[in-house]
């Protein structure tokens, strides 16, 4: 505010800037920024997505193991082939697909969290190219959640196996 304060010292420029941004544009004013808007808020969101993804992935791995130990049975779907060598077998493919989508989402989240807060003298436009991939990071996460939900919907508890192992 140095130059403009010299010309108009009677105006509270920080307050005037805040009022202008919030009233005319309807966004939250950020008083501590350089020539470009910081991307800290995006990094926090991406880190939150990654943490949630890790919970989903952990559930996927646990369900895969519970299915392999026969604590859960998968309900076969008419017309679906489980395996090329054992068509009668039902693979936990939904959980495996979810894991893969979590890995892709997390890779993008980490990469974007590392890239977005950096700028070359506030003149760097590479953040705009990077931000075009936010949809991919969120999309892979949503696909992972969807696959896990679909996998869980195909599972039933194998009470006989649980009782057998507990006795």
Q: Which role fits each region the language model picked out?
A:
Residues 71, 83-167:
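Glycine-rich cofactor/substrate-binding loops
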């Amino acid at each position: 505010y140095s130059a403009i304060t010299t010309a108009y010292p009677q105006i509270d420029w920080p307050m005037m800037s805040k009022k202008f941004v919030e009233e005319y544009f309807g966004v939250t004013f950020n008083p501590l920024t350089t020539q470009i808007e910081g991307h800290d808020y995006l990094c926090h969101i991406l880190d939150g997505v990654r943490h949630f993804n890790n919970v989903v992935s952990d559930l996927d791995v646990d369900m895969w193991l519970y299915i392999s130990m026969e604590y859960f049975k998968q309900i076969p779907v008419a017309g679906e082939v489980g395996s090329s060598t054992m068509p009668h077998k039902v693979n936990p493919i939904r959980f495996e697909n979810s894991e893969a989508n979590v890995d892709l989402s997390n890779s993008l989240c980490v990469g974007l969290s590392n890239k977005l807060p950096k700028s070359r003298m506030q003149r760097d436009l590479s953040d705009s190219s990077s931000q075009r991939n936010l949809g991919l990071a969120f999309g892979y996460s949503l696909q992972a959640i969807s696959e896990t939900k679909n996998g869980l919907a195909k599972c039933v508890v194998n009470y006989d196996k649980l009782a057998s192992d507990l006795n």
